[in-house]
């Protein structure tokens, strides 16, 4: 779930090495594995608090935007010789790209719509309309099981999922996708 370790191996690492890319990855605050416990405990005790939960994931988006901006600015002034061999940055700040897959594709819609620092990105397997996504997400299956154990029936679960969806309105890629540019 939204962890930087997803960029540390597998095909993306091989692709980066083959094409000469470097990867900067960060946990998606509010949407990563450590956040799942907070989400689960609130689902069981007070699902009505979920409309407030957009704040942490939105901070995660802002963190990603700040990292991108630092790639164009602060990181270029780094003096550590491991990062600046020959006193030059190890990357070309005019060639920054975004790649997000699954949750990274979904939340990446917000990042790509808001950033002025990246012209191109790949949104792999993205989605929009969080209430719809929650029903289809393999990661959310465990939460639905918790809901079934905590609420009386399908109607209650649907109401809780509706509340959940309203909490994501400010994060929904449907809100931001019109601002993606070519």
What are these regions (language model features)?
Residues 6-11, 59-66, 101-110, 116, ...:
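Generic recognition of stable, solvent-exposed alpha-helical segments in well-folded globular domains
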Residues 29-32, 39-43, 116-119, 124-131, ...:
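Active/binding-pocket-proximal capping segment
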Residues 126-182:
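The feature captures the conserved acid-bearing segment of alpha/beta-hydrolase catalytic domains
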Residues 18-22, 29, 70-73, 77, ...:
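Short, well-ordered loop/turn and helix-capping segments at boundaries between secondary-structure elements
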Residues 1-85:
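Cap/lid segment of the alpha/beta-hydrolase catalytic domain
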Residues 10-13, 55-56, 84-88, 106-112, ...:
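Generic recognition of flexible, low-complexity loop/linker segments
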Residues 3-8, 52, 100-104, 168-172, ...:
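Short, glycine/acidic-rich beta->alpha junctions
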Residues 70, 76-136:
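Primarily recognizes the serine-hydrolase "nucleophile elbow" in alpha/beta-hydrolase
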């Amino acid at each position: 779930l939204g962890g930087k370790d997803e960029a540390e191996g597998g095909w993306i690492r091989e692709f980066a090495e083959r094409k000469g890319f470097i990867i900067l990855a960060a946990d998606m605050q509010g949407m990563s594995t450590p956040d799942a416990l907070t989400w689960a405990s609130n689902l069981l005790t007070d699902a009505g608090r979920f409309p407030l939960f957009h704040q942490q994931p939105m901070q995660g988006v802002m963190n990603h935007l700040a990292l991108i901006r630092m790639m164009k600015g602060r990181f270029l002034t780094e003096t550590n010789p491991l990062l600046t061999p020959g006193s030059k940055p190890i990357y070309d700040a005019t060639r920054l790209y975004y790649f997000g897959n699954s949750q990274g594709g979904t939340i990446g819609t917000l990042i790509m719509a808001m950033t002025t620092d990246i012209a191109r990105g790949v949104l792999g397997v993205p989605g929009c309309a969080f209430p719809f996504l929650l029903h289809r997400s393999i990661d959310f299956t465990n939460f639905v099981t918790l809901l079934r154990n905590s609420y009386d029936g399908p109607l209650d679960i649907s109401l809780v999922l509706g509340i959940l969806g309203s909490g994501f309105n400010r994060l929904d890629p449907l809100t931001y996708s019109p601002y993606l540019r070519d």
